[in-house]
Amino acid sequence: MFTFSSPRDRDRLLREIELLAAALLRLEYRIATVESCTGGSVAAMFTELPGSSAWFDRGFVTYSNAAKEDMVGVRTETLRDYGAVSEQTALDMALGGVVHSAA
């Protein structure tokens, strides 16, 4: 879950999400999230925006290594060699999110 030092910080992030949403709609793109340590907080913020189903496809919460492997196809070797919190694992998660969604 995101923590904000003030309500203004939260409002600022929601405005940024609105800008992202407008760009996605204009370009006719959809987005998906693949999260681990954030536990779905990014997807939760996206879905706070009315009409987000027009541009937000889905969110994967892959906290465990098994979830990373099962849901988005992160390779066991990647997790073994680089660890769950690594650039390589994040890249595999992002690619898997594209492959397993309509984004």
Region locations from a protein language model:
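Short alpha-helical segments enriched in small residues
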Residues: 1-103
